[in-house]
Amino acid sequence: MKGLLLIGIFMFCPVSILWGQDRIQQYAGTAMPYPVVKDSSGFFQDSMVPFYVNHLGRHGARFPTSGKALNRVKEILELARRENRLTSGGVTLLSTIQNLSETFDGQWGKLSVVGEEEQRGIARRMIERYPQLFSDSVKVQAIATYVPRCIHSMDAFLACMVEFNSSLHIQRNEGKQYNDCLLYTSDAA
């Protein structure tokens, strides 16, 4: 009986681990990278003609907003090292955390290079999929909250658009006055 129980547990483990990964992606919200949709053919039918795009996006990938959690783990690991209670895995983890702290120093909350590329990729795909909407000197209005990573995301997005069409008429705004219409928080995100 124990053998059957163990077999059942081991059979279920891989499924539960995979199920857990889906849950992480589902509930991680803005901590996950932007998904890239490769096939947009299902977005509209052949008889439909796009005439307007309204893109409401979040900032791209960023550095963590603070080092508090990282510092707390580092303090615990350093205490364990001083007391000679750190395993070889712990030594490796401490080294990794020290390297991360140095790498992130002065970068907390800032948009990362990956975040810039995410924004540029969204703009590029939009222009490639709907070129008729971005021809000539069409007007593009862009707004962002006052948060630097959001402004930087908007600028990366717009820079890519200008690379494709330098005659675009871009109206760019930023500030706290846009928070009510742009800043949305959710328990699920």
Which residues make up each language-model segment?
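Bacterial Sec-dependent N-terminal signal peptides
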Residues: 1-22
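Short, solvent-exposed loop/turn and secondary-structure capping segments
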Residues: 65-69, 153-156, 167
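Solvent-exposed loop/turn segments at secondary-structure junctions
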Residues: 60-63, 147-150, 177
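Extracellular/periplasmic catalytic domains that process cell-envelope and extracellular macromolecules
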Residues: 46-50, 135, 150
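Loop-to-helix element that buttresses phosphate recognition and phosphoryl-transfer chemistry
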Residues: 105-129, 142-144, 157
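Conserved small/polar residues in nucleotide/adenosyl-binding loops
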Residues: 184-189
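N-terminal regions that are enriched for targeting/export leaders
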Residues: 21-110, 121-125
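Extended hydrophobic secondary-structure segments that form protein cores and membrane-embedded regions
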Residues: 54-57, 139-146, 171-174
